[in-house]
A protein has these predicted regions:
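Bulky hydrophobic segments
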Residues: 1-89, 93, 97-121
């Protein structure tokens, strides 16, 4: 569990670094901005289903990650070459919802497998 927590913090720090970098310093080869937002928040949310199976806690985590995305968008308004984007917030929240949903489905599938199959995966 400690490794998962540390990996999550490193991922969050990398995402934050990308979010707070002025536009002229970002690589030009990056794919679609909205896909990056969706993927980043999906990656942050996915492991949360393995940390807690409580729907109320997952809802709080989803709200917290979505609020973090909103606050980052506000800060980006003051970073050279970056701007506030509602479409980015939608992509962030979509990534959170799909990440938690996919994580929960993977966990449920793993728990539903017979023990003999579960050891193979």
């Amino acid at each position: 569990m400690l490794f998962l927590g540390l990996a999550w913090l490193v991922l969050a720090a990398c995402i934050a670094a990308g979010c707070f970098t002025p536009a002229h310093r970002l690589p030009t080869w990056l794919p679609n901005d909205k896909l990056l937002h969706f993927g980043a928040y999906f990656a942050l949310a996915f492991p949360m289903a393995f940390v807690t199976q409580s729907w109320s806690r997952l809802l709080l985590i989803a709200i917290g990650l979505s609020i973090a995305g909103f606050l980052i968008e506000i800060v980006q308004r003051y970073i050279p070459g970056r701007d506030f984007s509602i479409a980015d917030m939608v992509a962030n929240t979509g990534g959170v919802v799909m990440g938690i949903g996919a994580g929960y489905m993977c966990l449920a599938l793993h728990q539903a497998l017979p023990d003999s199959l579960g050891t193979l995966l």
